């Protein structure tokens, strides 16, 4: 949408035209087949006897997996759903309640409404109220919980103004809104329910709560040593699904930008009863479907199949020396999907295109390959979450130019000596002494860059076998 006051220069007009053409092309590619998905078929039996669905907000469990849940329950499979947040900070929905500018009270009312909607939707899918675990954390706070609000002493605050879970219906009322608590909640559910399959959001989703719920789910699974099947689902990724239309006879295909050698896309077929159950469950979320474009968006996920991605942990490249590796001497851990519309010349840069890693006898190298030369104008952060041996630990590194500093963000932070940074054209390399990884078998790695005049650009958190 072009806002009032937008300056329509020739480059801007060209960008709009190019964007429209590219988006149309993406839609055509995504819809090339009609009733059968391009993803590999997966049989219901392959999911096992117990399936755990972890969703960021009430309604995501239906949008991503509603038909699958209905099929599983009908087949006698045990299903449990965890709703991480209360979905209480959606401005447009809260404004409808307030009939104007929403207050903290309006957001709390929205949280209560969406909780009731989630229970009604669960019934439509064949679940019982006891199959739904509503954690009640504040919508929009998961990024803060993962970063600076990890400890109970530094809770996050959302639009409800609460720093503790404010809902009596939550699994743990009055729990501090912090990453440590959320991770423990997920670890407890995984350990107690012992699922054969866990379905969580995809790490490449473009909504922060979705991407960070993916990170928290991975963290919890790695913390408890979960060895079952891990699948992810996509709800928010740019203009996905293609197109935004109610097309129940059309297949759901993977976003073309997320096709990669390290990802296997799987399609679970839905029958008429599954699609009908999903449609009625979506309709229970009246606080969302009443918003015209959102209702259409939700119904666009009622297709002939539901879609899941399977990714194995990445493996870093092992080298015989500790010198800074070249691009060919490192392994790609996370590749940022290319933008649908090319970035205009002169826009805020750099962007992180990929995270690469290599390990020598004494040094772990983490490379952030960017779309422009790395200069001292941006501040990069590199994060590691370490598993195996002792309790999980975290290492947070801030880099400006070639000055690298470890930061103590949480009580489980470590600060090894000898961390340093080097720049090689479009790649920032961070060196971490291998001694800091002693006893660790797996890590999660993520990165971001704060660009001048722009919001931080974040690369997806991915797990790596060490």
Q: Model-predicted segments: where are they?
A:
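Acidic/polar low-complexity flexible segments
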Residues: 3-5, 314-324, 381-407, 424-425, ...
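Active-site environment of divalent metal-dependent phosphoester hydrolases
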Residues: 60-63, 89-91, 203-210, 240, ...
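Proline-aspartate-enriched helix->loop->beta-strand connector
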Residues: 186-205, 210
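Short, well-ordered beta-strand segments enriched in hydrophobic/aromatic residues
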Residues: 361-373, 427-433
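Active-site rim elements
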Residues: 105-108, 201-207, 263-271, 416
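Short Gly/Thr/Asp-enriched flexible loops that form oxyanion-binding sites at enzyme active sites
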Residues: 208-221
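Active-site rim/loop-helix segments in enzyme catalytic domains that contact anionic ligands
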Residues: 2-12, 16-193, 218-229, 236, ...
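C-terminal accessory domains and tails appended to enzymatic cores
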Residues: 2-5, 19, 27-38, 143-153, ...
């Amino acid at each position: 949408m072009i806002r009032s006051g937008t300056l329509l220069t020739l480059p801007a007009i060209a960008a709009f035209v190019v964007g429209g053409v590219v988006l149309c092309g993406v839609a055509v590619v995504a819809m090339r087949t009609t009733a059968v998905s391009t993803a590999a078929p997966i049989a219901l039996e392959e999911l096992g006897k117990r399936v755990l669905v972890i969703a960021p907000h009430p309604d995501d469990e239906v949008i991503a997996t509603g038909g699958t849940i209905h099929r599983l329950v009908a087949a006698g499979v045990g299903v449990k759903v965890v709703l991480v947040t209360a979905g209480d900070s959606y401005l447009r929905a809260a404004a409808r309640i307030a009939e104007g500018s929403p207050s903290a009270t309006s957001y709390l009312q929205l949280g209560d409404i969406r909780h009731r909607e989630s229970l009604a939707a669960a019934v439509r899918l064949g679940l019982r109220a006891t199959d739904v675990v509503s954690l009640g954390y504040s919508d929009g706070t998961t990024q803060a919980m993962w970063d600076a609000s990890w400890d109970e002493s530094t809770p996050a605050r959302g639009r409800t103004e609460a720093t503790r879970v404010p809902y009596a219906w939550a699994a743990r009322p009055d729990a501090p809104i912090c990453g440590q608590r959320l991770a423990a909640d997920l670890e407890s559910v995984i350990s107690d329910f012992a699922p054969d399959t866990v379905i969580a959001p995809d790490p490449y989703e473009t909504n922060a709560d979705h991407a960070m719920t993916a990170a928290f789910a991975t963290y919890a699974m790695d913390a408890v040593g979960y060895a079952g099947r891990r699948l992810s689902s996509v709800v928010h990724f740019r203009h996905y699904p293609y197109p935004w239309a109610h097309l129940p006879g059309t297949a759901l295909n993977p976003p073309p930008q997320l096709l990669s050698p390290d990802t296997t896309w799987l399609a679970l077929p839905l029958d008429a009863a599954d699609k009908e159950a999903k449609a009625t469950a979506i309709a229970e979320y009246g606080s969302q479907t009443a918003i015209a474009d959102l209702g259409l968006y939700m119904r666009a996920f009622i297709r002939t199949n539901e879609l899941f991605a399977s990714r194995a942990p990445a493996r870093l490249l092992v080298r015989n020396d500790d010198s800074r590796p070249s691009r060919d001497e490192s392994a790609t851990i996370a590749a940022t999907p290319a933008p649908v519309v090319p970035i205009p010349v002169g826009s805020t840069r750099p962007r992180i295109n990929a995270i690469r890693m290599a390990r020598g006898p004494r040094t772990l190298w983490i490379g952030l390959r960017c779309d422009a030369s790395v200069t001292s104008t941006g501040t990069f952060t590199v994060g590691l979450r370490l598993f195996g041996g002792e309790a999980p630990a975290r290492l947070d590194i801030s880099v400006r130019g070639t000055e690298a500093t470890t930061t103590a963000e949480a009580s489980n932070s470590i600060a090894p000596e000898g961390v340093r940074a080097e720049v090689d054209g479009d790649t920032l390399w961070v060196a971490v002494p291998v001694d800091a990884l002693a006893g660790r078998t797996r890590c999660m790695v993520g990165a971001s860059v704060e660009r001048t005049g722009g919001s931080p650009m974040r690369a997806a958190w991915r797990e790596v076998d060490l």
